[in-house]
C-alpha cells in the first residue's frame, strides 16, 4: 500500500557533495544538500542565498562539485557547519586549481568543474 508523505524532499540518498569556489582570492568549501541532474550536460546546485560561497560563484560564475567519500566526512561536515564569513576554510582540504583557477578537492574521487549558466532565486 502506498503512503502519502505530503510535500517532501524525498529523493534520497544523495552523494556527499562539497562545492568549491574562489571567494576573495581564496578557496572556500561548502557542503551541499541539494544537487540534481537537469539534462545530459547540466546539473543544478541549490544554495541558500546567504551562503558566503555564493559571492565567489556569482563573481566568477565557476564552481567545483566534489563528491567526497566517508574518509572526508568530518571535514565535509565542518565545511557545511561553519561559514566562510567566520572562518577561513581555504586549507580545510588539500586542493588543486584547474586552468581557470577553480579549486578542486585533491582527494575527492569525483570532481566536476562547472560554469554557471543561470541563477534562479526562490522564495
Residue ranges of predicted features:
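Active-site-proximal mixed secondary-structure blocks
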Residues: 1-31, 36-123
Amino acid at each position: 500500500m502506498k503512503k502519502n508523505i505530503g510535500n517532501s524532499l524525498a529523493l534520497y540518498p544523495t552523494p556527499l557533495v562539497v562545492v568549491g569556489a574562489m571567494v576573495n582570492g581564496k578557496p572556500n568549501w561548502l557542503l551541499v544538500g541539494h544537487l540534481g541532474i537537469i539534462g545530459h550536460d547540466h546539473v543544478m546546485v541549490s544554495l541558500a542565498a546567504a551562503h558566503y560561497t555564493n559571492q565567489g560563484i556569482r563573481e566568477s560564475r565557476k564552481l567545483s562539485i566534489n563528491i567526497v567519500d566517508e574518509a572526508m566526512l568530518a571535514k565535509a561536515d565542518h565545511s557545511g557547519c561553519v561559514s566562510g564569513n567566520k572562518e577561513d576554510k581555504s586549507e580545510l582540504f588539500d586542493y588543486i586549481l584547474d586552468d581557470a583557477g577553480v579549486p578542486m578537492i585533491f582527494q575527492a574521487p569525483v570532481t566536476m568543474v562547472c560554469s554557471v549558466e543561470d541563477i534562479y532565486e526562490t522564495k
